[in-house]
């Protein structure tokens, strides 16, 4: 059963949307609407964009050849990149929380089977 997600309550949904727009739709207008987690959203989005090459290298070093980032769906790529950014640069956030939040947010964009695959990665 899919859980309804409200982007107003899930900063990671907004992060995924902003990054997807920037990486794949040439959306360079990175304005951030008023939100109680605006600073966090802005930090993760801008940090992920700024450190994109470092994140790609980290993923390349930890995934097998058949699971390279470029072989994954674009939404998967965005979710993985932003989660990796948080793992590397937001050490105060527990890893379990980051994983859970991104898996929950992925339900907004992916089918159940795809979410399970994302969890396996």
Segments from the language model and where they lie:
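N-terminal interaction/assembly modules
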Residues: 1-108, 113-114, 119-121
């Amino acid at each position: 059963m899919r859980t309804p997600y409200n982007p107003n309550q899930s900063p990671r949904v907004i992060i995924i949307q902003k990054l997807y727009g920037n990486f794949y739709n040439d959306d360079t207008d990175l304005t951030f609407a008023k939100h109680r987690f605006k600073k966090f959203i802005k930090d993760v989005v801008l940090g992920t964009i700024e450190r994109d090459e470092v994140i790609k290298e980290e993923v390349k070093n930890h995934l097998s050849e058949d699971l390279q980032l470029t072989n994954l769906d674009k939404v998967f790529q965005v979710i993985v990149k932003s989660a990796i950014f948080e793992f590397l640069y937001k050490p105060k956030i527990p890893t379990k929380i980051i994983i859970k939040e991104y898996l929950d947010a992925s339900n907004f964009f992916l089918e159940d089977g795809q979410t399970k695959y994302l969890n396996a990665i």
